[in-house]
């Protein structure tokens, strides 16, 4: 069997080569354009379909939270897993009240929050 039968469909080391000496996600800095949302904005998490992997947890979908930080620019995991690095987007750090995610959450801990990073495609104005 010749070596040509063992070559990957795409260069799986492309991303590592691109990030060498710069870092990831820093290698995507400036590629997402202007952010759609800002710190302090209230956003609702869309319930978009996903194939096998997403950074957007199911329990956040449909919930409303507050953006506390624009974290970085990067392709979403759903795209990057298939070698699609053209769709660079903003990732936001969003804070949710635990009670908004789990209504049965004890009132004893009413001030508890959860903070997570979510890509822009999953966000809409609340």
Curated annotation (Swiss-Prot):
InterPro entries: CN_hydtase_beta_dom_C, Elect_transpt_acc-like_dom_sf
Top-tier EC class: hydrolase
Short name of one Pfam family: NHase_beta_C
The enzyme's E.C. designation: 3.5.5.8
Top-rank taxon: Bacteria
Reactions listed under catalytic activity: thiocyanate + H2O + 2 H(+) = carbonyl sulfide + NH4(+)
One of the GO BP terms on file: thiocyanate catabolic process
GO molecular function, one term: thiocyanate hydrolase activity
Pathway: Organosulfur degradation; thiocyanate degradation
Keyword Hydrolase: yes
Keywords assigned: Hydrolase
Subunit record text: Heterododecamer consisting of 4 alpha, 4 beta, and 4 gamma subunits.
Function statement: Involved in the degradation of thiocyanate.
Protein name: Thiocyanate hydrolase subunit alpha
Organism annotation: Thiobacillus thioparus
Gene that encodes the chain: scnA
